[in-house]
Swiss-Prot record:
Main location: cytoplasm
Name of the protein in question: Tyrosine recombinase XerC 1
HAMAP family from the UniProt entry: Recomb_XerC_XerD
Matching PROSITE patterns: CB, TYR_RECOMBINASE
Function comment: Site-specific tyrosine recombinase, which acts by catalyzing the cutting and rejoining of the recombining DNA molecules. The XerC-XerD complex is essential to convert dimers of the bacterial chromosome into monomers to permit their segregation at cell division. It also contributes to the segregational stability of plasmids.
Catalytic residues, chain numbering: 163, 198, 272, 275, 298, 307
Assembly information from the UniProt record: Forms a cyclic heterotetrameric complex composed of two molecules of XerC and two molecules of XerD.
Residue ranges occupied by any Tyr recombinase domain in the UniProt entry: 123-320
GO biological process: cell division; chromosome segregation; DNA transposition
GO molecular function, one term: DNA binding
Record's subcellular location: Cytoplasm
GO terms for cellular component: cytoplasm
Length: 329
């Protein structure tokens, strides 16, 4: 685990505060925490003690106030520590003060309560360029049933922005027989898929013409992989493995990565990259955030807004390349 403070905050560490040692013993013998977790707590509390000596000199740690904690947090943040790491430190400190309050009447308030770590910047999802996406769709080698299936899988991911779990759950068509009922299905004639997404929310997504062509080609060879005595879960599955079983998530991930390399796509390609690429390219083309939200099945528009950052990056790049006053001399 990386340290929770810059190196200069860890030089010449002072002996542990007696109550910190007692707290670590309680974590070890009463809560039976692992050595790894104990070491993490010890590091975070050592940082508290070192920063306390700097920003609250002459004040016992047990008497620190919220403004002391905020100054310490600002020091950690200014030293380049991530919001997640600061949150971990605050959690350890908060736990120590809670423990103290149960044992020392003089500790009447927890100075860490109500203090939150700064938010770390959201990691933007990776997306293929349009050229890379086209290469992945059009340059997959082979014409055996598995290769034809893989092209249909890729086209459907990119056309509909489906989650991996949604795609593997697709049936050939809506089916209900005995105890079996389709949760998600393809309607190729209507050129749409109906999927059961997160939170058991069902949505219908249109299928593009290229994906429809790839699906028709796959359906023509699918009988070569189908098994006559298959269980309903496999018999109704849209995508089958070489053994006639419903195609598994791991199989899709492995083959997609291998096919991407064969197509000369340098990015680390996996199903979610195609979902991100779908969203990014749709937003760049339409600018309709609400429509992209509906297509992706996001419950909140906030989940979709991350793609506006990607769109701005795209626009900024085009500006830098095209605007005569933006070009570097």
């Amino acid at each position: 685990m990386p340290p929770s403070a810059p190196d200069d905050d860890r030089d010449a560490p002072a002996p542990p505060h007696p109550q910190i040692g007692a707290y670590l013993d309680a974590l070890k013998f009463e809560r039976k925490l692992s050595q790894h977790t104990l070491a993490s707590y010890a590091r975070e509390l050592a940082v508290l003690q070192q920063l306390g000596a700097r920003f609250a000199a002459g004040i016992d740690l047990m008497r620190l106030q919220p403004h002391h904690i905020r100054r310490m947090m600002a020091q950690l943040h200014g030293g380049g520590l991530s919001g997640r790491s600061i949150a971990r430190a605050l959690s350890a400190w908060r736990g120590w003060y809670q423990w103290l309050a149960l044992r020392d009447a003089a500790v009447t308030a927890n100075p860490v309560d109500g203090i939150r770590a700064p938010k770390s910047p959201k990691r933007l999802p990776k997306a293929l360029s349009v050229e890379q996406a086209v290469a992945l769709m059009e340059q997959l080698p082979g014409d055996d049933p598995e290769a034809v299936r893989d092209r249909a899988v890729n086209e459907l991911f990119y056309s509909c922005g489906l989650r991996l779990s949604e795609l593997v759950g697709l049936d050939l068509r809506h089916a209900q027989a005995g105890d079996y009922a389709s949760a998600s299905w393809l309607d190729l004639e209507a050129r749409e898929v109906t999927v059961l997404g997160k939170g058991n929310k069902r949505r219908t997504v249109p299928v593009g013409s290229k994906a429809a062509e790839a699906l028709a080609a796959w359906l023509a060879v699918r009988p070569q992989l189908a098994q006559p005595d298959a269980a309903p879960e496999d018999a109704h599955a849209l995508f089958l493995s070489a053994r006639g079983k419903r195609l598994a998530q791991r199989q899709i991930q492995t083959r997609m990565k291998r096919n991407a390399i064969a197509a000369g796509v340098p990015a680390d390609v996996h199903p979610h990259v195609l979902r991100h690429s779908f969203a990014t390219h749709m937003l760049q083309s339409s600018g309709d955030l609400r429509a992209v939200q509906e297509l992706l099945g996001h419950a909140s528009i906030a989940s979709t807004q991350v793609y506006t950052s990607l769109d701005f990056q795209h626009l900024a790049k085009i500006y830098d390349q095209a605007h005569p006053r933006a070009k570097k001399k």
